[in-house]
Swiss-Prot record:
This is Eukaryotic translation initiation factor 2-alpha kinase 3. CDD domains: Luminal_EIF2AK3, STKc_EIF2AK3_PERK. It is found in: Endoplasmic reticulum membrane. InterPro entries: CC_SR_Kinase, Kinase-like_dom_sf, Prot_kinase_dom, Quinoprotein_ADH-like_sf, Ser/Thr_kinase_AS, WD40/YVTN_repeat-like_dom_sf. The modification Phosphotyrosine is found at Y615. Its EC number is 2.7.11.1, 2.7.10.2. Disruption phenotype: Mice display diabetes mellitus and exocrine pancreatic dysfunction. Pancreas is morphologically and functionally normal at birth, but the islets of Langerhans progressively degenerate, resulting in loss of insulin-secreting beta cells and development of diabetes mellitus, followed later by loss of glucagon-secreting alpha cells. The exocrine pancreas exhibits a reduction in the synthesis of several major digestive enzymes. Mice also show skeletal dysplasias at birth and postnatal growth retardation. Changing Y615F: Decreased ability to phosphorylate EIF2S1/eIF-2-alpha in response to stress.
Amino acid sequence: MERATRPGPRALLLLLFLLLGCAAGISAVAPARSLLAPASETVFGLGAAAAPTSAARVPAVATAEVTVEDAEALPAAAGEPESRATEPDDDVELRPRGRSLVIISTLDGRIAALDAENDGKKQWDLDVGSGSLVSSSLSKPEVFGNKMIIPSLDGDLFQWDRDRESMEAVPFTVESLLESSYKFGDDVVLVGGKSLITYGLSAYSGKLRYICSALGCRRWDSDEMEEEEDILLLQRTQKTVRAVGPRSGSEKWNFSVGHFELRYIPDMETRAGFIESTFKPGGNKEDSKIISDVEEQEATMLDTVIKVSVADWKVMAFSRKGGRLEWEYQFCTPIASAWLVRDGKVIPISLFDDTSYTASEEALGDEEDIVEAARGATENSVYLGMYRGQLYLQSSVRVSEKFPTSPKALESVNGENAIIPLPTIKWKPLIHSPSRTPVLVGSDEFDKCLSNDKYSHEEYSNGALSILQYPYDNGYYLPYYKRERNKRSTQITVRFLDSPHYSKNIRKKDPILLLHWWKEIFGTILLCIVATTFIVRRLFHPQPHRQRKESETQCQTESKYDSVSADVSDNSWNDMKYSGYVSRYLTDFEPIQCMGRGGFGVVFEAKNKVDDCNYAIKRIRLPNRELAREKVMREVKALAKLEHPGIVRYFNAWLETPPEKWQEEMDEIWLKDESTDWPLSSPSPMDAPSVKIRRMDPFSTKEQIEVIAPSPERSRSFSVGISCGQTSSSESQFSPLEFSGTDCGDNSDSADAAYNLQDSCLTDCEDVEDGTVDGNDEGHSFELCPSEASPYTRSREGTSSSIVFEDSGCGNASSKEEPRGNRLHDGNHYVNKLTDLKCSSSRSSSEATTLSTSPTRPTTLSLDFTKNTVGQLQPSSPKVYLYIQMQLCRKENLKDWMNRRCSLEDREHGVCLHIFLQIAEAVEFLHSKGLMHRDLKPSNIFFTMDDVVKVGDFGLVTAMDQDEEEQTVLTPMPAYATHTGQVGTKLYMSPEQIHGNNYSHKVDIFSLGLILFELLYPFSTQMERVRILTDVRNLKFPLLFTQKYPQEHMMVQDMLSPSPTERPEATDIIENAIFENLEFPGKTVLRQRSRSMSSSGTKHSRQPSCSYSPLPGN
């Protein structure tokens, strides 16, 4: 019996295994229960609220990790309840009453706490094990065609329409999906749900105390939990949407978004009170005591401002005074939510508020409406970002509250009579970075960013918004309200307001936000200053006057004349009116540059606004007298009749009568180019003086010359003594009332502007070109206005001649102190008398019958204004300008061409004959039309771009049978012949012109002879040129010329015959044998063009040349 009942070894072993099994079964109950949670949720429909990745995350809740980084925190983990039982009471030290924590929720599902009073040091970090807040299978925008669904973290959906570039709320919420499925399209049905999980945490240590869900609650260390410990309640809301096919039930896409909400339970409050909605803040004495403790410790955070930067994942603290950065902490993932826990209160930090909030929750009566309006104006924003390749939205509370919750209210959402309009967000994204230019992003660029983001997955998890790279780095802000926000900063401010009077100042501007824009503000201020200065100087200050050259001197006038001129100038300026006048020249043409002056006017290069071709526009000031005006109009009539390839082409002409002083002001603008250093206003061509030589010998050192103005009422006169001794070059530029020249025996390069009064001003003087008073045909330095200190103002001994100018065309020529636009007063006509024209000379009187190689020069210059009277000043008459549109040629003329080729080797014989032949053909055409040029010289011969020779400057062209009755009226040069003005270039004038005899078209033949000789025989110096050409005029040719060119010598000798009848016709010159033996390209073609184009003038007139402008001869 004993033996039977005695347990054997096998029974003992079996009993031992049973005891061990029971012990193991008890310890496995909790894990087994936790493993049932996901299965139960799935069975009861809660699993539908979790994404495919979230179904496996629920078991991880039981093993949450807590990382305590504070030095005072406990080292134990939340998942190890055993270690917490042996912990000392250090929690009491870790949670002083005045301590403040910043709780941060990130998109990866972690919760972190920062100590706001300890330089933002991380207090603890908790991974609750529930996974990321955002997960989705939506990867490409092509899923919905031109529309795209973007989820928001709070569970709402937005639909982005690419066509309309707008973001609007999808007409359903997750709550409505719990009641019934909603059909999104013809082939898609949307279903969804949400799950709630609540976590209880120790406020200051981060220890996980319990977890509650729909399946129940699990607690840790409930026996050792301190009753006085503050508890943080984290409630995670996870919402899931799935799209399935209505027929097959297959899933097309899904997404899951979630967010945390934070509650604070101070001290003895039961944890079930929050879940059962029985928690009443401030309902016990302990809360009152805590509030009193807060008031005592608030001084430690008096000047602290907490900011959360969503785009940079930073939490920062600034001092309110001065905006100094006290501390900052940057997370590795985007921030989803933020709260400030301070002494029994949880202050949510808004992610869409760019100004400050207080911690006070008290109502302010009348100010409540103002505060709400201010909040609505700034909080209505949406932040668009990307996490692990999925777009998501963070919307403000204001936008979420506007979403309709009833599907019935949205039945006519697509119609015009919608019951509740959907909230719409205009697609005007704002870049988060305030230091970069805030540009707007179009839908095309946004699509491009989406397509480039296909690799934005796990490798971009640390760069959460990888879609939005520079310049759109880290995200967009979309304003919900119509008026766009003025500020671009995404940093949100929370202030600690400690004084009672701060409670009424609900929102205050951030004191440091403008510091990000200091560069833009400084640049804007600087730009405004520069623009204002420029506008003021242009509108209210006159243009600076051209500085006087060294060769220019101040006019010497009497004080009486100065005062009268100044008064007239001021009155004219005050009476000037510009309104209502439109210039045809400025309307049809775009001025390019002023090419030069000569031939009665000024020549501009201008571009036609219609055909985009450049033309030469010649402007001539017409005189008021009818007969004198007819002389100027003769050039227009002559040009209009001339249709020949060797003559500068005429296109159009018109008259303009601008208001007083308008033209002078425009000249100051047009003639700023230093390359055209002409005076800014020109004299009237017909108001120029007439010259009367009282001796038949025009080059005698004792001649007396009177220059008499055609207008009898002008009585003001002045006397001028002209001194010599100055030297100039061929490129000397004439300034007002100044003429460049040389001494009596010096070299000069300008032989065509000796006494050129034509353009002492651009608008008012006549071209008295090369009407020199001595034998040297070069330019001479005539300074009509020297200073008193000049030694040349003294009278010198020697021969003298008297020149009397009754009008020079520039009434106030001596008043150079006035602005250039005010120099001319046509109504102030004065009689000007030039006297004491002295120049020493060693020439004998026997040389008076011929052109002297070294003629006499004047030596002194003086002004004598003795007859000025105020009563003689009369109002000026309106100025009339004639504009002539001509062909544009190269600026280089034949004179320049020869000056650059000063040796026989540089001048090919065939080229020279080719140039001369083209000139002769043009002259022959003129003669065939019954016209003569009378002023042929190298400076009047131009070239086109294809080297075709053009004869220009027809200011002296006149008919061969012109009526000679003009002599009795104009009497320009009574000692000369009877044609217009008799002001041709003297060096190339025929003997009959110089001696004042009647002449015919043979004067052009004489000039052609000299031009042919000068082409074939180059000169090394201008002095040599004057001397040899003077001898050639007397048929004294150089030996080298006669030996090298015998045929040309005979031809030139015939052309320079003293008798006009013995000179050949232009036709005979063209048919000369010297041209037949030469072969050069273009001769035959040129002559054919001459015949064909002259017969079809209308057709040719429509083919303007777009090259360079002609320089009228000087």
